[in-house]
């Protein structure tokens, strides 16, 4: 990738600082996006109550459920630990292809360095699958049989509906407001090789 000063194809241009942050992003993810530019909703998205243009953040390792039952959260974590060696409900960044209903602002998400994604094509949101306490272990096992692991965004993009919850396992990520989509598209199209 070569460094550009600005991309002026859109009203919201990419500054040198934004491009410097993009240069830290996982290159394979950027290449996957480049192949998906003609698709709608081709970025990982996350809704938050943050109100900043862009930033780099660390993924919390102690996430607690806000709407889900703690027992269901812990049961799922135990199953994810058995199958994928990660407490995905506590240690993942939750994203989707369409994050408009979560939080006040929607951001485009770019994992930094190594990452992978866990998702179920059959269960869009595990919160909605919460059973009675006595049925939790069996339900969690059933769900985990459908969960897939991939670091190929094109594969995940093609295998999920826009509303599916995607658990991104990474240490840090770059997030930028959705209003930069056109400028990002142009930068990725022209600069990512």
Q: What is each of the regions a protein language model found here?
A:
Residues 12-23, 55, 111-193:
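Active-site and NAD+-binding cores of ADP-ribose-processing enzymes
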Residues 49-52, 99-102, 114-116:
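Short, solvent-exposed loop/turn segments at secondary-structure junctions
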Residues 83-104:
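Extended catalytic/binding region for NAD+/ADP-ribose chemistry, centered on the ART fold
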Residues 105-111:
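Active-site regions of enzymes building and remodeling cell-envelope glycoconjugates
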Residues 27-36, 95-100, 152-156, 162:
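Intrinsically disordered, low-complexity boundary segments flanking structured domains
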Residues 3-88, 170-171, 178, 185-188:
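ADP-ribose/NAD+-binding catalytic cleft of ART/PARP-like enzymes
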Residues 46-48, 95-97, 110:
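Short His-Asn-centered micro-motif
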């Amino acid at each position: 990738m070569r460094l550009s000063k600005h991309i002026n194809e859109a009203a919201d241009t990419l500054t040198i600082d934004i491009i410097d942050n993009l240069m830290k992003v996982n290159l394979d993810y950027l290449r996957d996006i480049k192949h998906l530019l003609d698709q709608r909703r081709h970025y990982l998205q996350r809704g938050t109550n943050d109100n900043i243009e862009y930033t780099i953040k660390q993924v919390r390792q102690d996430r607690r459920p806000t709407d889900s039952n703690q027992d269901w959260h812990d049961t799922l974590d135990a199953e994810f630990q058995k199958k994928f060696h990660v407490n995905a409900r506590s240690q993942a960044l939750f994203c989707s292809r369409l994050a408009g209903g979560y939080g006040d602002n929607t951001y485009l998400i770019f994992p930094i360095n190594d990452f992978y994604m866990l998702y179920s094509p059959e269960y869009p949101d595990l919160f909605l699958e919460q059973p009675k306490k006595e049925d939790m272990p069996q339900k969690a096992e059933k769900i985990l049989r459908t969960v897939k692991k991939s670091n190929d965004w094109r594969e995940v993009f093609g295998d999920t509906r826009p509303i599916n919850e995607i658990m991104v396992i990474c240490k840090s990520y770059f997030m930028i407001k959705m209003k930069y989509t056109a400028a990002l598209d142009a930068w990725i199209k022209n600069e990512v090789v």
